[in-house]
C-alpha cells in the first residue's frame, strides 16, 4: 500500500522534473 504522502511527493517531483526537462530541451 502506497502512502498518500509518498505518492504526492513522487508525483510532484516527476512533474517538476518533466517540466524542467521540457524547458531545457
UniProtKB/Swiss-Prot annotation:
Enzyme Commission numbers on file: 1.1.1.37
Protein keywords: NAD, Oxidoreductase, Tricarboxylic acid cycle
Domain of life: Bacteria
Single GO biological process annotation from the record: tricarboxylic acid cycle
Reaction catalyzed: (S)-malate + NAD(+) = oxaloacetate + NADH + H(+)
One GO MF term attached to the UniProt entry: L-malate dehydrogenase (NAD+) activity
Record-listed NAD(+) binding positions: 11-17
Record function comment: Catalyzes the reversible oxidation of malate to oxaloacetate.
Family designation: Belongs to the LDH/MDH superfamily. MDH type 2 family.
Protein name per the record: Malate dehydrogenase
Organism: Phenylobacterium immobile
Amino acid at each position: 500500500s502506497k502512502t498518500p504522502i509518498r505518492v504526492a511527493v513522487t508525483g510532484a517531483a516527476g512533474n517538476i522534473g518533466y517540466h524542467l526537462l521540457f524547458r531545457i530541451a
